[in-house]
Amino acid sequence: MATTLRDILDKLLGRQPASAKTARERLQLVLAHDRSDLSPELLDQMRREIFEVVAKYVEIDLEEGEVSLETEDRMTALVANLPIKRSQAKAVSSQENGASSQEAVSSQESVSTPGAME
């Protein structure tokens, strides 16, 4: 389901897609679901989990993100289109540093001092 120049112009000019084209896209989606043997519930669960995993590393636009099944040349693919707002690499590394320093503090507290147990 590649986007063509005509599709882009239709969107910009507010034109509605032809009913035959819409019906064809719906049929392709139904065929993709049938061939993959994935229920809509399972696909929705996969979508949520994919969003959660990706959100650990980058901030994504949940409203614009989508996960879909696409069929081309008798091959079905799971396609995730997730617009990235910004990277969270700094947040991840600072969380790791925070955990390391917390572990260091905990290990220092557990070290017994001479005379403390007497």
Curated annotation (Swiss-Prot):
SUPFAM superfamilies: Cell division protein MinE topological specificity domain (SSF55229). It comes from the Bacteria. Residues 99-112 have a biased composition (Low complexity). It holds the Pfam family MinE. Residues 86-118 are annotated as: Disordered. GO terms for biological process: cell division; regulation of division septum assembly. Keywords: Cell cycle, Cell division. Prevents the cell division inhibition by proteins MinC and MinD at internal division sites while permitting inhibition at polar sites. This ensures cell division at the proper site by restricting the formation of a division septum at the midpoint of the long axis of the cell. HAMAP family: MinE. Belongs to the MinE family. This is Cell division topological specificity factor.
